[in-house]
């Protein structure tokens, strides 16, 4: 899989610069590049590999809304691509690259604050359709437009998973932001629960989504474990609403996995 991305990157680096191609052809090439960039970036996050799709002269703004665009039939598709592309650019630069060099994601507390602000700015740039939702609205949308549901949940999962990694990052000068990690982890894993509840058959086969949820549960569990070691930590976990909710997230994830494997919850 990794070699595929290297080859795809080499191929696209050669062919994306086509000054005499039609606008439609250029858009097709941009769409292919965008797909490679997204797959490469978000898989390198999960697999802790160095990113390979890092050199390009193509920007998010190059994706057009004109009639010649292959996504022009549905503006929501173009909005989803732009949002995913913007997020991928930020993740590649701030998470994938430091990890590949064995560097901390955040070297100072000020750096971490700026990085969180950068992620929130990207999130604010997402169209309302991908941000302003609840379980009831998605349940209704799943019956009328499941494509938008998939886009919403995939984008939500991707965003909050990477924000969780930023909050959970630590270095000699920067501790883990416990509450920030649990908040982002909850939002990320909730997207997985929603996908499973609304589109169960699809949720079972999306490896990337399932693996992200596993890593989110693991991160939440690690935070709870470390908190329990501190003085008064167990009482905090039992009484603080944020920690109680995080424990419930772990329980729901384990129950979900048991159902997928056909194992009774009582074994837990």
Map each language-model feature to its residues.
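Short linear/disordered segments characteristic of secreted peptide precursors
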Residues: 65-67
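TPR/TPR-like (Sel1-like) alpha-helical repeat modules
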Residues: 248-258
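Extended, leucine-rich alpha-helical cores of fungal transcription factors
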Residues: 1-57, 70-121, 139-226, 236-244, ...
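Long, charged, glycine-rich C-terminal linkers/tails
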Residues: 129-142
């Amino acid at each position: 899989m990794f070699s595929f991305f290297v080859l795809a990157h080499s191929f696209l680096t050669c062919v994306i610069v086509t000054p005499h191609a039609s606008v439609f052809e250029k858009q097709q090439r941009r769409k292919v590049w965008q797909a490679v960039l997204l797959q490469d970036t978000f898989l390198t996050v999960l697999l802790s590999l160095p990113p390979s799709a890092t050199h390009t002269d193509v920007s998010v703004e190059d994706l057009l809304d004109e009639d010649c665009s292959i996504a022009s039939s549905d503006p929501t598709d173009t909005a989803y691509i732009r949002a995913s592309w913007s997020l991928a650019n930020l993740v590649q630069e701030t998470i994938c690259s430091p990890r590949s060099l064995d560097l901390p994601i955040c070297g100072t507390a000020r750096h971490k604050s700026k990085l969180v602000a950068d992620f929130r700015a990207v999130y604010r740039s997402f169209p309302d359709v991908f941000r302003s939702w609840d379980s009831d609205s998605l349940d209704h949308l799943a019956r009328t437009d499941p494509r938008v549901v998939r886009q919403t949940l995939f984008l939500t999962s991707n965003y909050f998973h990477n924000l969780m990694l930023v909050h959970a990052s630590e270095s000699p000068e920067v501790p883990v932001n416990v509450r920030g990690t649990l908040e982002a982890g909850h939002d990320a894993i909730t997207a997985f629960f929603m996908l499973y509840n609304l589109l169960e058959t699809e949720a079972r086969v999306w490896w990337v989504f399932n693996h992200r949820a596993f890593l989110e549960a693991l991160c939440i569990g690690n935070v709870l474990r470390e908190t329990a070691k501190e003085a008064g930590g167990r009482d905090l976990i039992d009484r603080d609403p944020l920690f109680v909710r995080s424990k419930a997230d772990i329980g729901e994830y384990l129950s979900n996995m048991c159902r997928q494997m056909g194992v009774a919850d009582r074994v837990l």
